[in-house]
């Protein structure tokens, strides 16, 4: 299942929409809830990011993200 993570690189400042970045994770989970938990654990262990929101993507959403040219799976 593919997840899109919205985050701030600087976790010492209040989040601002203008500085929000996104990354994509491909996780082997059975449910969306398991994926959100696993994504938060991976990000906490491997980054200092301030995670704002995590959402699973449908196949159609993945295709749209690929068309925008910014789709790249992040691995830790």
Curated annotation (Swiss-Prot):
Its EC number is 2.7.7.6. It is an enzyme of class 2 (transferase). GO terms for molecular function: DNA binding; DNA-directed RNA polymerase activity. The keyword Transcription applies. It catalyses: RNA(n) + a ribonucleoside 5'-triphosphate = RNA(n+1) + diphosphate. Keywords: DNA-directed RNA polymerase, Nucleotidyltransferase, Transcription, Transferase. GO terms for cellular component: DNA-directed RNA polymerase complex. One of its GO terms (biological process) is DNA-templated transcription. InterPro entries: RpoY. A non-essential component of RNA polymerase (RNAP). HAMAP family: RNApol_bact_RpoY. RNAP is composed of a core of 2 alpha, a beta and a beta' subunit. The core is associated with a delta subunit, and at least one of epsilon or omega. When a sigma factor is associated with the core the holoenzyme is formed, which can initiate transcription. Belongs to the RNA polymerase subunit epsilon family. This is DNA-directed RNA polymerase subunit epsilon.
């Amino acid at each position: 299942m593919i997840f899109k993570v919205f985050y701030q690189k600087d976790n010492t400042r209040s989040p601002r929409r203008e500085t929000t970045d996104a990354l994509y994770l491909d996780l082997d989970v059975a449910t969306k809830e398991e994926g959100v938990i696993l994504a938060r654990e991976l990000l906490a262990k491997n980054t200092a990011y301030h995670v704002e929101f995590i959402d699973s993507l449908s196949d159609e959403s993945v295709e749209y993200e690929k068309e925008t040219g910014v789709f790249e799976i992040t691995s830790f």
